[in-house]
């Protein structure tokens, strides 16, 4: 029954006017939730209540979606275009969803908002003047540490919005709030939030690389940096307002992600730079649009595994490993075509050790004074 149901869902005629980042409250997102035995009626009730509040004609400060969208758009225009999502531990992955929504919707025409998810939280002095923090606080979670960190950010003058969630079902309300807010922010930035003009580029490059592989029997070999050279390259390109995007083509593991957190922490501490992280090829449909179409402030560190052991793809003349490397190379070439600085490092036999080697070599940067700005007041969810 489950197999039949899944097949029927897959065969559904999805509405072509719904962006992939807006599917969470459609059948695409709700059916998996139902299979997990979540209360769908309760989810939709929370989302519907938020929709009513966002659709009513009222002052911006009383409209949850318009308020967040106006804050994101106005602060981005003022130079605070790095929206850093903080969330209670049980809902920490919300930031990954918001990452795709914001990056895919706003990153175009050399404008956009850079979403930051699951970055280690540090002292306020470590952050530059390009940050805007949004804190999703879940009632009943262990929030003591995060509460203190957020309060420190507010005292230091960083703009912070806090949304209070009664329980996890309030995430449905947040989904609608953020979708509405993203459209508002896109309007303020003067871009069309419902298209993805640069997503296809990397796909086309990947196909060209694979065609070359099937003809020549090998993939092109881009210039590869050692961990030491990677750090030199990164350090030489970091400027005020930059962000470092770490793009990893490797098997996801907890140990590897812990190493990535150490690297992100080192970069923020030493260079006061924003960091993002994504696994390839997943990020191509998340932050990939922003990387190529958004502001030219990104510095890209591409980490590529040896892809062993490997598996052959049925009915194809290449393996999954070759496909992944072709996707990495295709995106690298697309980034370079847009004038983006890209540094590639081969992870080698021990990906964790390679990432740690980069983190240990991150150079300190001269300290600079932190600029204080006006605070953004707390906005509850209900």
Predicted segments, located by residue:
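Active-site phosphate/pyrophosphate-binding segments
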Residues: 15-132, 142, 170-274, 285
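Conserved, well-ordered active-site substructure
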Residues: 283-317
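Single conserved hydrophobic/aromatic residue that forms the stacking wall/gate
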Residues: 1-14, 18
């Amino acid at each position: 029954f489950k197999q039949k149901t899944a097949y029927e869902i897959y065969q559904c005629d999805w509405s072509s006017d719904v962006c992939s980042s807006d599917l969470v409250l459609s059948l695409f997102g709700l059916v998996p939730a139902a299979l997990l035995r979540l209360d769908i009626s309760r989810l939709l009730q929370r989302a519907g209540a938020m929709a009513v509040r966002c659709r009513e004609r009222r002052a911006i400060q009383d409209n949850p979606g318009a308020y967040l969208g106006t804050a994101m758009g106005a602060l981005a225009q003022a130079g605070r275009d790095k929206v850093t999502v903080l969330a209670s531990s049980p809902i920490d992955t919300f930031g990954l969803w918001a990452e795709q929504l914001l990056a895919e919707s706003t990153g175009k025409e050399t404008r956009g908002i850079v979403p930051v998810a699951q970055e280690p939280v540090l002292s306020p002095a470590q952050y530059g003047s390009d940050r805007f923090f949004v804190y999703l606080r879940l009632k009943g979670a262990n929030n003591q540490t995060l509460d203190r960190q957020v309060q420190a950010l507010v005292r230091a003058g960083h703009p912070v919005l806090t949304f209070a969630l009664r329980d996890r079902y309030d995430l449905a309300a947040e989904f609608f709030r953020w979708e509405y807010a993203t459209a508002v922010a896109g309007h303020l930035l003067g871009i069309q939030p419902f298209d993805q003009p640069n997503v296809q580029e990397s796909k086309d490059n990947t196909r060209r690389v694979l065609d070359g592989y099937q003809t020549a029997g090998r993939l092109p070999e881009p210039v590869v940096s050692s961990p030491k050279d990677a750090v030199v390259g990164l350090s030489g390109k970091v400027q005020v307002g930059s962000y470092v995007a770490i793009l990893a083509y490797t098997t996801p593991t907890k140990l590897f992600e812990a190493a990535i957190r150490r690297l992100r922490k080192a970069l923020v501490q030493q260079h006061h730079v924003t960091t993002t992280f994504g696994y390839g090829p997943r990020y191509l449909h998340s932050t990939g649009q922003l990387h190529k179409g958004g502001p030219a402030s990104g510095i890209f560190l591409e980490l590529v595994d040896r892809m062993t052991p490997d598996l052959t793809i049925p009915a194809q003349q290449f393996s999954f490993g070759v496909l992944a490397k072709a996707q990495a190379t295709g995106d690298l070439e697309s980034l370079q075509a847009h004038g983006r600085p890209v540094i590639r490092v081969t992870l080698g036999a021990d990906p964790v050790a390679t990432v740690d080697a980069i983190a240990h070599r991150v150079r300190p940067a001269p300290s600079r004074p932190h600029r204080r700005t006006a605070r953004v007041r707390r906005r509850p969810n209900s």
